[in-house]
Amino acid sequence: MDKKNEQQEVREENDTSINQESETQVELEEEVVNEECETSSEKTDEKEVDDENVTDINSKLAEKKLQDELDELNDKYQRLQAEYANYRRRTQQEKETIGVFANEKIITELIPVIDSMERALDACEDKEDTMYKGISLVHKQLIDTLVKFGVEEIEAESKEFDPNLHLAVMQESVDGVEANQIVMVLQKGYKLGTKVVRPSMVKVSC
């Protein structure tokens, strides 16, 4: 009986050991499965992160490309604006130059007429004469018209001689007058803006 009991106990111990080994094997298998699941989940998470990074990079690249194109278009627009402004300025300058040259030709033709009127006025002794008054009126109107177009008489009387404005045709030593001073205007000079149309003809002290 004792021997049978011992055998029974041995069998029970063996069964218990087998059961424990089976449970341990199952637990190990479960751990492996769990680890594989966790690894798979981590890989999935990593893939999602990588996809998000790629999407973010592509978005930034597209944004930078768009900004570069916008900057290039803005630069072209500013250059076109500058070129157009330069074109308008050149066109305006050309118009003004053409206008000045056209006016200069007319003025050059009118100046001798003014000279003739002034000689006639100087020669007239009776300032109350109808002829004198008529010539004087026309002379004034002509001078006023030329002034509107930018014509002005060159100052010369008692001024220092300037070869850019005056033409010296005579020299004379005058007491009390420094050298190179204009002592007499023989013919009036005129300029259109800054351009001399006709220099003043003068006598200069020496």
UniProtKB/Swiss-Prot annotation:
<dbReference type="GO" id="GO:0006457">
    <property type="term" value="P:protein folding"/>
</dbReference>
<comment type="similarity">
    <text>Belongs to the GrpE family.</text>
</comment>
<comment type="function">
    <text>Participates actively in the response to hyperosmotic and heat shock by preventing the aggregation of stress-denatured proteins, in association with DnaK and GrpE. It is the nucleotide exchange factor for DnaK and may function as a thermosensor. Unfolded proteins bind initially to DnaJ; upon interaction with the DnaJ-bound protein, DnaK hydrolyzes its bound ATP, resulting in the formation of a stable complex. GrpE releases ADP from DnaK; ATP binding to DnaK triggers the release of the substrate protein, thus completing the reaction cycle.</text>
</comment>
<dbReference type="InterPro" id="IPR009012">
    <property type="entry name" value="GrpE_head"/>
</dbReference>
<dbReference type="InterPro" id="IPR000740">
    <property type="entry name" value="GrpE"/>
</dbReference>
<comment type="subunit">
    <text>Homodimer.</text>
</comment>
<dbReference type="InterPro" id="IPR013805">
    <property type="entry name" value="GrpE_coiled_coil"/>
</dbReference>
<dbReference type="GO" id="GO:0005737">
    <property type="term" value="C:cytoplasm"/>
</dbReference>
<feature type="region of interest" description="Disordered">
    <location>
        <begin position="1"/>
        <end position="56"/>
    </location>
</feature>
<feature type="compositionally biased region" description="Acidic residues">
    <location>
        <begin position="24"/>
        <end position="39"/>
    </location>
</feature>
<keyword id="KW-0963">Cytoplasm</keyword>
<keyword id="KW-0143">Chaperone</keyword>
<keyword id="KW-0346">Stress response</keyword>
<dbReference type="GO" id="GO:0000774">
    <property type="term" value="F:adenyl-nucleotide exchange factor activity"/>
</dbReference>
<feature type="compositionally biased region" description="Basic and acidic residues">
    <location>
        <begin position="1"/>
        <end position="14"/>
    </location>
</feature>
<protein>
    <recommendedName>
        <fullName>Protein GrpE</fullName>
    </recommendedName>
</protein>
<dbReference type="GO" id="GO:0042803">
    <property type="term" value="F:protein homodimerization activity"/>
</dbReference>
<dbReference type="GO" id="GO:0051082">
    <property type="term" value="F:unfolded protein binding"/>
</dbReference>
<dbReference type="GO" id="GO:0051087">
    <property type="term" value="F:protein-folding chaperone binding"/>
</dbReference>
<dbReference type="Pfam" id="PF01025">
    <property type="entry name" value="GrpE"/>
</dbReference>
